[in-house]
């Protein structure tokens, strides 16, 4: 019986699952919207929401705690400095999941997970900067 067992297995090992959630959290913090399967999005939501709730404090202990989870310094900086201040007055519910149909190959349910008050320009900034460097 699965009484009081939280989370989904996603048919992968626990270390793979933790690494996948950390990588997806970095991608979500960087781009503020990502497309993934619906079960992965549902697993990512509580993971990222606890990180944002911690980041609202913005002290050294929180910085180290968040860095131990996601292991990317630029994502931690953005999480604490930008997202922590953006959601300072919001008591929770920082993300939304939007269902986006089914994947063509295997009919897996696809969803977008995004921040509620996201910066629309955040998704394209990295590609625009890369294109400018190539032209120069």
Swiss-Prot record:
Family matches, as PROSITE patterns: RIBOSOMAL_L17
One term of GO molecular function: structural constituent of ribosome
Superkingdom as given in the UniProt entry: Bacteria
Record SUPFAM superfamilies: Prokaryotic ribosomal protein L17
Residues making up the signal peptide according to the UniProt record: none
InterPro entries associated with the record: Ribosomal_bL17, Ribosomal_bL17_CS, Ribosomal_bL17_sf
BP GO annotations: translation
Ribonucleoprotein among keywords: yes
GO cellular component terms, semicolon-separated: cytosolic large ribosomal subunit
Keywords: Ribonucleoprotein, Ribosomal protein
Family annotation (Pfam families): Ribosomal_L17
UniProt key word Ribonucleoprotein: yes
Disulphide-bridged cysteine pairs: none
Subunit architecture: Part of the 50S ribosomal subunit. Contacts protein L32.
NCBIfam families found in the cross-reference section: L17
Homology family: Belongs to the bacterial ribosomal protein bL17 family.
Record protein name field: Large ribosomal subunit protein bL17
Taxonomic source organism: Rickettsia conorii (strain ATCC VR-613 / Malish 7)
